[in-house]
Amino acid sequence: MRNRETKNFKRKLAKATAIGVAGGLTDFMATTGWMHRSLTHKAYKLAPPIEGAARAVIWGTGTRPRVWATVHRAHHENADVAGDPHSPALQGRYGVVKLFFKNTPLYSQAARSVEKEDVFAPDLQPDELDRKIFDKVQLGLAASLVAHISANRVAGNPGYMGAISWVVEKTVYIFGGNIVNSIGHAGAHPFNALVTGEISPQPDGTFGADSKLVSLLTLGEGNQRYHHEHPGSLYFGEIPEGTGLPARAAKDFGGTAALLLVRMHLAEPATVLPETMSPETASAELGMASV
């Protein structure tokens, strides 16, 4: 009897875990496909229904997109120098490991600074949906939990397993952000930086790194060196002639999806760069960035 109950619980747990991982990957897709490349860097503009869906997904993560975008733009202005708390290079020895665990509280600190200043670029001003719905991030987290309860019931699980899948989703999402901001800025030899604790800069003195593994895990966000060199690029990386769709997707799933959306006329490449804060404003008024 006990063995049967154990097996049943394991099946329920496996279903809840799968739902949570799927939710985390959906969060990654909304983050890289809309909040990062579209909203923040203006690489393209998504069709309204797709953008609306992405906004709803991000709402469920408890994130205010204009705050995230402001923090991220400030990070680009201060990448791996004083004022950028997400840089492993500024964390001392074993900075990659330290930053992995410190990234989330450091982002929260930067976000609170942005919220306090309440200063946003012209293209990041809140609209009616933000004011009425999406700024209410606690409600978004609650709605996300309700969605998990419903998904578990549809999958044949009891509703209470929704709490487990909800936690799994948030853990996956946080893990993705932490690994991007740590290994993504681990310099010329990320693996050596993990093992020896010493981070070596790239030949040009920067610390951005391109990691195939991180890109696979985060749907394309692992190519941080290329991204910092080409922040407005739709695809994070070079696309050699003759490269097939699977190879492109393996390198940058989010960018490949964006390319397909453009071809399907569901996204429009940007022709105007976003209006952003100056480096002085980003550093002095917005505080430290960590995304």
PLM regions with names:
Residues 1-178, 211, 223, 232-291:
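Non-catalytic, topology-defining segments of multipass membrane proteins
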